[in-house]
Amino acid sequence: MFQINDNFQKLPGSYLFSTIAKKVAAYQEANPDKEIIRLGIGDVTQPLAPAIIDALHKAVDEMGNAATFHGYAPDLGYEFLRKAISDNDYKARGCDISADEIFVSDGAKSDSANIQELFSANSRIAVTDPVYPVYVDSNVMAGRTGTYDAQKETWSNVIYMPSTADNGFVPELPKEVPDMIYLCLPNNPTGTTLKKEQLQVWVDYANKNGSVIIFDAAYEAYISEADVPHSIYECNGAKTCAIELRSFSKNAGFTGVRLGFTVVPKELKCGDVSLHAMWARRHGTKFNGAPYIVQRAGEAVYSEAGKAQLKDQVAYYMNNAKTIKTGLAEAGFTVYGGVNAPYIWLKTPDQMTSWEFFDYLLENANVVGTPGSGFGQIGRAHV
């Protein structure tokens, strides 16, 4: 008889955002007259920028003509998009990342879950607490996290790096050396980030100890302070210890379009084995390439018109974050974030748990937040 992957049975409950969606749907069904403000997932509300729409229309027209039709895309991405990414996101910031070190995908979420496939099953991971749940869940599925303590909401084989108000949401270097270190900066969910000299410390630590940093830079477009790096490759030595994940969802509103990319430098090796070559092999086996239409839309992100339009969109979302943070602070809540990321991290009042405050917000203000416990133990008293 066939057997299942028992590691899936270790996953506690349902995925955080699926649970939120079910609770909101039930509330909406019971209260059809209520207008709900949905802040429970990092989705966008503004339409795609005109430059992107124009690129989509043009690409669709090409697909309707036999002479310009495109079938399967190159599995690693079209050269026109990879070059645009290299020139604008990296070389423009002094980062020596070439187009062929960029792997185009259907989004950062899938890449952040899949990247762990490059590493052995006995590799140990280190994550911040709170943490984006995909990093942990994907390693649970791979059998890498040990046993789960439901009371503490922790895994026995995961190294946790607390990020709290007491340390300014800047985790300390782990005393126990991990094989893989997950960093999301600017951070989801706390909205905080590191300055370049702080990030350099992590790069030096990884190189010294033979660790790999999985660096999620999905929110880099929201950085407003000059001394905060947009890429880990702005740090010396990062190409020998870091993989970077990027998304078009946050900077360009592609949540319903789906596009992202991962950077795996050729210098990143385990002994004589190239992780760049491994990821290329994995990508070619498991992915048929992002659609031509979508990649042309991605290229438009880097056009002059696209840059200007998206700058305005980012400003719109950051103004929303500022408004929310200011209002909550004036109402007496303790809040963080909202400077280099569109996230506000709120301390729940009156010793309420995050799910209790989630229900309170939904039932009394018709507002959907995200319970902090979904991001880890430290998030129990936050949304």
What does each model-found stretch correspond to?
Residues 140, 151, 234-315, 322, ...:
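Conserved core segment of the aminotransferase class I/II
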